Amino acid sequence: MASPEHPGSPGCMGPITQCTARTQQEAPATGPDLPHPGPDGHLDTHSGLSSNSSMTTRELQQYWQNQKCRWKHVKLLFEIASARIEERKVSKFVVYQIIVIQTGSFDNNKAVLERRYSDFAKLQKALLKTFREEIEDVEFPRKHLTGNFAEEMICERRRALQEYLGLLYAIRCVRRSREFLDFLTRPELREAFGCLRAGQYPRALELLLRVLPLQEKLTAHCPAAAVPALCAVLLCHRDLDRPAEAFAAGERALQRLQAREGHRYYAPLLDAMVRLAYALGKDFVTLQERLEESQLRRPTPRGITLKELTVREYLH
């Protein structure tokens, strides 16, 4: 079984590897090395095929084809398109709009997010704790004593922050780090899972569908990282009486788990898919057999439901 889980910590597979080379000295990827995006640093230790996998020959071929494809590096471009000043009762700050697109092909799922200067500063502080040597040549745009809200200064800092993100992304260990992923996705995911817990399914779904494409691009080397969010999409659709859309989201999640029967989401997801398949008149027997085989090999004291598991994510 997977090692003990920490609530609020969606797991990702593989060891944490430290980067010892700069961008121009990057070595090819040899295994998943993304720390999972939760706050507690837990890693799912079950990567790769289960030794007791019951996959058919065709499924095995598809699995290894996916393994080859997963190492194709997805290249992203960061653009800070605009900035605006926002004033509140006791504070005044600049909000930057970040657009993230995939290069090399038409990207109809570009991500648009907003971050404050203080968010960038927190990212820099977090990265210095783990990657001080790796980012020593990356200049972070500092605040000035005066003039921070002048139009010329905002434009200058906008360009500098855009360059900053590009330089960070060029460093392999940084772009795969929990800190970088959290900066780009965690605020939206935390709000989405909060809405899920509150039963606000339309709003949760809106946020999830906005952030999921970016999360999947950032974790292309670690497909299971997006499983919690995909399961949240399944739950939203299911509770909004959209079983077909829920089933489609579940299929995407299962594809990312492949034969990883030890993953904490594997059995709860299969159980939910069996019920959806039955309701939709689809083949639920095959899914039921996979679930039963998994439970025989990895018996658990009490089956946790997919919803019980998913609502524990992003609590903090």
Curated annotation (Swiss-Prot):
GO terms for biological process: protein transport. It is a peripheral membrane protein. SUPFAM superfamilies: PX domain (SSF64268). A 1,2-diacyl-sn-glycero-3-phospho-(1D-myo-inositol-3-phosphate) binds at R116, S118, K143, R157. It comes from the Eukaryota. One of its GO terms (cellular component) is nucleoplasm. Its main location: membrane. Changing R116Q: Decreased binding activity to all phospholipids. The modification Phosphoserine is found at S3. Disulfide bonds: none annotated. Keywords: Cell membrane, Cytoplasm, Endosome, Lipid-binding, Membrane, Nucleus, Phosphoprotein, Protein transport, Transport. It is found in: Early endosome membrane; Cell membrane; Cytoplasm; Nucleus. Residues 74-191 form the PX domain. Interacts with SELPLG. Interaction with SELPLG is controversial. Belongs to the sorting nexin family. The PX domain binds phosphatidylinositol 3-phosphate which is necessary for localization to the endosomes. May play a role in cellular vesicle trafficking. Has been proposed to function as a sorting protein that targets SELPLG into endosomes, but has no effect on SELPLG internalization from the cell surface, or on SELPLG-mediated cell-cell adhesion. This is Sorting nexin-20. It comes from Homo sapiens (Human).
